[in-house]
């Protein structure tokens, strides 16, 4: 929600005066073809317990994935997300950091390096799908979302995304 709070603040408004954000719990519920299920969200301890219930011993791989995604987040979100790449050399200077973060791997391949269970690999590779990407060929930089969700949670605007658009329009009119 903080990014929308910042956006509304640019116009001297408070986001909560226009739209309410609700915390989502669980963040995702995965139902697999074998009938098994995984609820993802909450504390990292709850997630590890849920993963180990589904696939004993895989919880450590998930923790390692989140720790790696924090490294990606530090570069991809904190350092680069608000930077213009309008000059070729601006992007070229980022190549060493992006290589160190294995950006040449797809989301699915990076997730697979931490998790062995095929169900978990699919579940924890979904983020590119949310923006129309394919986890099999979208850069692993999108794995930063694992840490982003851990840091800030998953939120939903009451009334759906249309209510968020309406709130932005109203804030501009007033």
Q: Where are the predicted features?
A:
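Short polybasic amphipathic segments
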Residues: 27-32
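Conserved small/polar residues in nucleotide/adenosyl-binding loops
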Residues: 174
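N-terminal FAD cofactor-binding segment of flavoenzymes
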Residues: 1-25
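Rossmann-like flavin
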Residues: 33-139
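Residues forming anionic-ligand binding surfaces in small-molecule and nucleic-acid pockets
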Residues: 138-149
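Generic structural marker for isolated residues within well-ordered, non-membrane alpha-helices
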Residues: 4-5, 48, 108, 165
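Short beta-strand to alpha-helix junction loop
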Residues: 96-107, 149-170
